[in-house]
Curated annotation (Swiss-Prot):
<feature type="modified residue" description="4-aspartylphosphate">
    <location>
        <position position="55"/>
    </location>
</feature>
<keyword id="KW-0378">Hydrolase</keyword>
<feature type="domain" description="CheB-type methylesterase">
    <location>
        <begin position="179"/>
        <end position="370"/>
    </location>
</feature>
<dbReference type="Pfam" id="PF00072">
    <property type="entry name" value="Response_reg"/>
</dbReference>
<dbReference type="InterPro" id="IPR000673">
    <property type="entry name" value="Sig_transdc_resp-reg_Me-estase"/>
</dbReference>
<feature type="region of interest" description="Disordered">
    <location>
        <begin position="150"/>
        <end position="183"/>
    </location>
</feature>
<dbReference type="GO" id="GO:0008984">
    <property type="term" value="F:protein-glutamate methylesterase activity"/>
</dbReference>
<dbReference type="GO" id="GO:0005737">
    <property type="term" value="C:cytoplasm"/>
</dbReference>
<feature type="active site">
    <location>
        <position position="221"/>
    </location>
</feature>
<feature type="compositionally biased region" description="Low complexity">
    <location>
        <begin position="150"/>
        <end position="180"/>
    </location>
</feature>
<comment type="function">
    <text>Involved in chemotaxis. Part of a chemotaxis signal transduction system that modulates chemotaxis in response to various stimuli. Catalyzes the demethylation of specific methylglutamate residues introduced into the chemoreceptors (methyl-accepting chemotaxis proteins or MCP) by CheR. Also mediates the irreversible deamidation of specific glutamine residues to glutamic acid.</text>
</comment>
<feature type="domain" description="Response regulatory">
    <location>
        <begin position="4"/>
        <end position="121"/>
    </location>
</feature>
<dbReference type="GO" id="GO:0000156">
    <property type="term" value="F:phosphorelay response regulator activity"/>
</dbReference>
<dbReference type="InterPro" id="IPR001789">
    <property type="entry name" value="Sig_transdc_resp-reg_receiver"/>
</dbReference>
<dbReference type="GO" id="GO:0050568">
    <property type="term" value="F:protein-glutamine glutaminase activity"/>
</dbReference>
<feature type="active site">
    <location>
        <position position="314"/>
    </location>
</feature>
<feature type="active site">
    <location>
        <position position="194"/>
    </location>
</feature>
């Protein structure tokens, strides 16, 4: 059965080109279009699409407000189009926080030329998020939706570090069957993720105390223009410190370093971060396998690694190296994943020492390390 898609954009050109690209795939059916957020809500309720592609800047109602309403009234996987700018990154992160599953850069030049790479990427994203966890609405903010704001309104983040997680609590998935972890003198916590990762990392890291005793490295598949904004966002929400990693940074307790987009991050035995150019032969920049592999070489059995929601199998080979060195590997459970791909690869390869729900992982990190 074809994946039913609703295309939402105030640009007639972009709406038409996205519809043409998707309709050229016989396994995808464009069932409707909308020009603003209000129309998107009405069409989502009427057409019940499998996936919605959504612009942000639109008249009547912006895309983020529309996503919040859709997640409350008819939870549907949403693919956001975003600009590759710092401000575009902040807006995209707001959309993911509201419940969108994934995003794509909005590039008029690329889409007008209609290169094969754009067509392939768009169709792959649509197919992937159509299979995402239909409980996705439970991972959006649970606060009541406010009256629609003008499209130009942007809610700024609070400037003070909160004493507790800033997100409203979402419904908690059933507890996993893995036992609580045993305490061990870990020298490093390494967390890798992809689709669904921005919200998942926020949920995990906001549970950690400011005096968390182990250094943390984060590998999130994300463009270069987005990682700095994402690190800044996490730093404002968490009690630990979070920053985008730079070459020469030193690991230290209570600090999480986020791998920069478009590059690779490695760690040496002295706790020094090495940032390397992204290898074009690798599918992911940053790549979880690269960072996990360097951690295995430098820290032996003293690494606690966690693989969260995401498509594909990045992290599996790095986790294999960590296991061979005696380190610990956790995977997020299927029920709480947006996309059960990367964690599934860990589980199927028999590399997982424990499988926990998203809401358990932060608590268990504290139990294992503090």
């Amino acid at each position: 059965m074809a994946v039913k898609v609703l295309v939402v954009d105030d640009s007639g050109f972009f709406r038409r080109r996205v519809s043409e690209i998707l309709s050229a795939d016989p396994t995808i059916q464009v069932v409707g279009t909308a020009t603003n957020g209000k129309e998107a809500i009405d069409q989502a309720l009427a057409l019940k699409p499998d996936v919605i592609t959504m612009d942000y800047e639109m008249p009547m109602m912006d895309g983020i407000t529309a996503v919040r309403h859709i997640m409350q009234r008819c939870p549907t996987p949403v693919l956001m189009f975003s600009s590759l700018t710092h401000e575009g990154a902040r807006v995209t992160l707001d959309a993911l926080d509201a419940g969108a599953v994934d995003y794509l850069p909005k590039n008029f030049e690329d889409i007008s030329r209609n290169p094969d790479k754009v067509k392939q990427l768009l169709c792959e994203k649509v197919h992937t998020i159509s299979r995402s966890n239909r409980r996705i609405g439970s991972y959006a903010r649970t606060a009541p939706v406010a009256a629609p704001a003008p499209a130009s309104t942007f809610t700024s983040q609070a400037q003070t570090r909160p004493a507790a997680p800033a997100r409203a609590a979402a419904p908690t998935p059933a507890a996993s069957q893995s036992p609580a972890p045993k305490r061990k003198p870990y020298k490093l916590v390494a967390i890798g993720t992809s689709t669904g990762g921005p919200v998942a990392l926020q949920r995990v890291l906001t549970q950690l105390p400011a005096n968390f005793p182990a250094p943390i490295v984060l590998i999130q598949h994300m463009p270069a223009a987005f990682t700095k904004a994402f690190a800044e966002r996490l730093d404002k929400l968490c009690r630990i410190s979070v920053k985008e990693a730079e070459d020469g940074d030193m690991l230290r307790p209570g600090l999480a370093l986020l791998a920069p987009g478009g590059k690779q991050m490695m760690i040496d035995g002295r706790g020094t971060v090495k940032i390397l150019p992204g290898d074009e032969r690798l599918n992911y920049k940053p790549c979880v396998d690269i960072t996990f592999g360097s951690a295995a070489k430098s820290y032996g059995d003293k690494v606690l690694s966690v693989v969260l929601t995401g498509m594909g199998a990045d992290g599996r080979e790095g986790a294999r190296l960590l296991k061979q060195g005696g380190s610990t590997v956790w995977a997020q459970d299927e029920a709480s994943c947006v996309i059960y791909g990367m964690p599934m690869a860990i589980v199927k390869a028999n590399l997982a020492d424990a499988v926990y729900s998203l809401d358990e992982i932060g608590k268990h990190l504290v139990e294992a390390c503090v």
